[in-house]
Amino acid sequence: MAKIHELSENLTNQIAAGEVIERPASVVKELVENSLDAGATRIRVDFIDAGLKQIVVQDNGTGIARDQVDLAFTRHATSKISNEHDLFKVSTLGFRGEALASISAVSHVEIVTATENAIGIKADFSGGSKKGQEDAASQKGTKITVRDLFFNTPARLKYLRSPRTEIMKIVDIINRLSLGYPHVSFTLSNTGKVLFRTTGNGNLKQTVANVYGRHIAEKMESFEAKDSDFKITGLMSKPELTRSTRNFISILLNGRYIKNFQLNNAIMDGYGSKLAARHYPIVVITIHVDPMLVDVNVHPTKQEVRLSKEKELSRLITDAISDALLDKTEQSSGFANLENKRETLVDQLEFNLNQDVVNTTRKTPEVHEEAEKPEFLVKQEAKNSEEPKNETEHNYVDINIPREDDQYIITKTWDKNVALQQKLMPFSNKKVDQEVISTGDETLANNLPRLAYVGKIDTYLLAENDGDLYLIDQVAARRRLQFEQIYQTITSKKIVQQGLLTPIVLEFGNLDFLQIKDKIYQIKQLGIYLDEFGQNSFIVRSYPTWIHDHVEESIREILDNYLNLDKGKTQNLFKRVAALEAKRSVKGKINLSAAEGTQIITDLRKTSDPYHDADGRLILVRISQNELRKMFKKGE
């Protein structure tokens, strides 16, 4: 066994830095939290090369006295606690006195600081040692510049991720802190280009607009509650506005962003069954509590805390969100009758296929969902089964029905002056069948026998084969057909674009904007072309024809889900997007004719999996002749 010896101060500083400073975002977090503890109302963060080359944090806080600068860079030196009793009632973001010492141990640090009506001071530190000091002109506040992070511990660099990912982690830190301090003005810049700015006017909804985008903030509602120990306030998204991960839930405890599984579950419980499976809300919740009830000294990053009365707090959060949703539901219940009348109108519609036919040519079969607006197109059955298989010309019948909303997307055919709303029945004629079947697995498809259409009950089709009865969920079946068509279109790399008469401008939060930029090539493979258009915005001038008529809403949801997909093969990503659009475009029962029901059954047999939709839900159930006989006790 080697001889035990005491480690050098330089080495111990580097070890300590490893616990606190994991990446550039850790530096930003520690320095900005110091600024907030100093009472700053304006904080500016600039970085270069994802923070590895340089990070600058400047504030208008109280500053550091001249004779305390050296002490500030000493390990376990702090102004925030004085004795062991203070450790159990921490009211500041920092308290260990490790941040500046840890940062200076693995970088070159320059600090310029001044207190009220005092001469400023400039000091330099490198590798944990002081290199120089001089007077400097400075306003009240502190400016810290960190250069060449990990210059003396190069092994740490190999554990960092891509520059884009490191930038997004910095952005996420500032986002969370700005949500906790809406009265503080934050500015974040990358190589001189402003990525993010808040006004600091104290309006949380305005800060949410800065972080997530105005379109998100407009769909969020406030909530609040309190008891003898806790006071909670915040903003919550409506149930229809969700994300595919929990990353958009921000819990701020006395201004500190924390991660807490129990409180996350309390938020989800507040929404109850109003959220779709694997969908999560956007929530910003601020919790005010006596510091005596919180132990923040349980994790190096201080993002995990130990809470007294956690169960009581969880119940308070759940009830507050549930009550807020109940209030909104009662206010909107008056719209239910209008929706029922609209559905009745659609159900009573008799499809007249003898009207004049409007011809248009598309390479991609389009999508139909149950008419949310009662004006749509119905595809006419092909009259000539001997038409060439490589043709993709579709015939449509235009049925005009009074509509509630005159706002819809105009489809522009460049060689004809024809305006059509893009909604049609998702049933392939025989020409398109050849495209669908080419993507399927013949072995699997042939396992489904040829079924004869019998009739329908509500949303279910009835079919039979050799005395066996089959119940087919028409919604799931249509989604499977739609998925096959969309997936084949995307993977064919021959995606037809439809021009927009009026381009769509999509505004995103700063983090989403960076993520989209990072995946712009993969998004183009979907046929979605985005061009930067101002700060945190993209412009869309055309869209792929496999998207149905709610173009902006559809693209937003596709991008949101696409961003949150786990990394994997591009084909798997294509399947997820195709499944999403199939689910969006087919949302309810429609009044099917016998011919249309027969066509669904015929097409279903040609798909890659006729038994499940793209989300794995069951499409059909078989009841054998023997089972039917047993039900009626035949043969006994």
UniProtKB/Swiss-Prot annotation:
Keywords: DNA damage, DNA repair. The keyword Cell inner membrane does not apply. Residues 362-393 are annotated as: Disordered. Coiled coil: none annotated. Residues 363-393 have a biased composition (Basic and acidic residues). HAMAP family: DNA_mis_repair. This is DNA mismatch repair protein MutL.
